[in-house]
Amino acid sequence: MRRTDLLSSAGSQAATNEAGNKVVTVDRRTHVTWQDVTPEGYFNRVRTLDLDSGAWSEICTLGSAYDDHARAVMVADGDGFLHAILSGHNTPCTYRRSLRANDAAGWTDPVPVADGTYPYLVCGPGGDLFLTLRNAERWNGVELLTKPHDGPWRHVGKVIERLADYPGYAAFHCGFCFGADRVLHLVSDFYEGFGVWEERGVHQAVAYLQSPDGGRTWRTFRGEPAATPARPCAMDVICQSTGLRHEPMPPPVLAAQGNIALDSAGVPHVLYLYHLNRAGELILASPDESGIWRQRSIDASLRSAYPKHRAMFCRGTFTVDADGVFRALVTLVPAGHSGWDGHLPTRPGLRGIAGGRVPAADPEADNPVMWLISRDRGATFTVREAFPAAAEARSPKYELPVSGVPWPGGRGILYFDRTSRPVPGTREDPGFQNRVYFCRETAW
């Protein structure tokens, strides 16, 4: 049975974007966070669904936001308290904790953590919080911070560093998780170039590291020490490409976007999109018994079911459950869409699909969202529709196993649509409002 509820009619043009977790279930309550935009500015919100009654709480405002990049991520600890990081955009990120366990109605005062963007938050062993942020000083790499269960936030160190040869814009989208042995497994994208508005993305890579001690020291999967801040040459490189691109500010031609998951044996699996061979290739990478990373395309069933579409987005929507079932939530775009330049994604054509404003009548709007599901450890995948194109779902997110409470699986999907209504009563252009929905699916 499916049920879709409207949470807000004022979601920003990036209301649910990026890889960090936005859905948290504790016992019989599900808490969700997203970003609104109003004439007064951007605001991060939270609401709670009572799974027994089906009733939603009133909207609670976590805080104002610098812009549409400054969205919130949220987890729960083992006692059920909620923890939220309110992102900045190369500006201060702040931390808040719920005043009561499993209750999003009241929060502690905001505490500055660090300047940065694109937070990824995990509740680790013993209830300690772990956070990665892109560095705010000209996008210079990735910082790791931690908050002990009963202590303040502290800076652990810089994990990833931008190469000085690439002084321009840089992005490093991370995802990480802990195994039962307390080993931290991290995947990071690299997107570096020479300029801010041109010659972007000259160097792109997806690479992996692990840490046995909460980020103090790092190593490859085979145990080779890796000095940090690290470059791909010291990491397990899963894929990499260097060269001038097809446009000045291209979307990534390869990216994991935080997609890392562990199976029951503690083996990491990384899912990434790769457009250099053909549009929308989905590749699953996993180390074998000798520690060598093996890779295979997994989108054959998707291309067979939707031959006129290609995979474009899979941002922080990949998991492996306790039964060994692999799941990925993938957004498709027609092969002939203006979002493609041949087999490569193009920024002008993607406006309105990932976020931003959508034309009032978009003849190309045909973006179904699909589940890719494997019940044989990733050997084969089946396809199941999550949303038809008519739902106009953008940036769908389901719950990730990053909290300190048992993970219920992805039984609900948070997303925003293509409303793109100008914010009323404003002279300047603060953004566009969209409807934000939560779709609850009981047949997981």
State where each predicted segment sits.
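Extracellular, repeat-based ectodomains that mediate carbohydrate processing or recognition
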Residues: 1-444
